[in-house]
Amino acid sequence: EVLLEGPSGVLFKDGQKKYLPPGVKIVLLTESGAVLSNGDNVQF
């Protein structure tokens, strides 16, 4: 779950931080992870 999303990154509820390149956004968010618009995956 996303706790905070800003123009330069995302803070997930579990404390993970993911810095995002300009223009990259979350395109899919599930209970176990997220897929970013640049194809990267974040597991939590």
UniProtKB/Swiss-Prot annotation:
Top-level taxon: Eukaryota
A GO MF label: structural constituent of cuticle
Organism encoding this protein: Cancer pagurus (Rock crab)
UniProt-listed InterPro entries: Cuticle_1
Pfam family, any one: Cuticle_1
Tissue localization of expression: Calcified shell.
Claim: Repeat is one of the keywords in the record: yes
Annotated Sequence repeat ranges: 3-20, 27-44
UniProt keyword list: Cuticle, Repeat
Protein name as annotated: Cuticle protein CP466
